[in-house]
């Protein structure tokens, strides 16, 4: 099976450590890092998950600009203390004219609403793909999904769409 993943991606950095003392110049804890883990995130995470499921032929089309999400995590409890996002918006650099959609068994759209894909881009992907999946954070109505085979939404995104007046 050959799968194409299209969407926003980032670098996820997890800095694990602990807080054993308070800062002398402000009433905040001092974080002491002990380990750093770096992963591909968003659309990159979709690729990693597909490969973990045994899909070996996976291509990705994603943003050129680097988005970084750095999470500071207390290593004993695994509690996230802080997340720092860098370069959270990217340009719409997607060019569907160079994609042979027929050569893919399935297309996955991982749209995190960071700017890489427009509504028009996503609509075109749904129309041109044989088997298509979409996970979007955009506020949309039900007509937006009519060309997609599968739709994945979190409750927050669902509620935003319903609040917009979508008729489901």
Task: Kindly label every feature range from the protein language model.
Residues 1-20, 34-168:
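Ribokinase/PfkB-type carbohydrate-kinase core domain
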């Amino acid at each position: 099976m050959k799968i194409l993943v299209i969407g926003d991606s980032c670098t996820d950095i997890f800095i694990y450590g602990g807080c054993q003392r308070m800062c002398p110049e402000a009433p905040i804890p001092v974080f002491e890092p002990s380990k750093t883990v770096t992963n591909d995130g968003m659309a990159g995470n979709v690729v990693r998950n597909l490969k973990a499921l045994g899909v070996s032929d996976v291509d990705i089309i994603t943003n050129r600009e680097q988005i970084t999400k750095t999470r500071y995590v207390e290593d004993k409890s695994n509690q996230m203390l802080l997340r720092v996002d860098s370069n959270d918006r990217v340009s719409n650099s997607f060019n569907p004219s160079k994609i042979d959609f027929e050569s893919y068994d399935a297309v996955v759209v991982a749209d995190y609403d960071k700017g890489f894909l427009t509504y028009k881009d996503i609509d075109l992907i749904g129309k041109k793909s044989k088997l298509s999946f979409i996970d979007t954070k955009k506020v949309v109505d039900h007509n937006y999904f009519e060309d997609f085979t599968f739709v994945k939404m979190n409750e927050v995104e669902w509620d935003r769409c319903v609040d917009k007046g979508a008729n489901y």
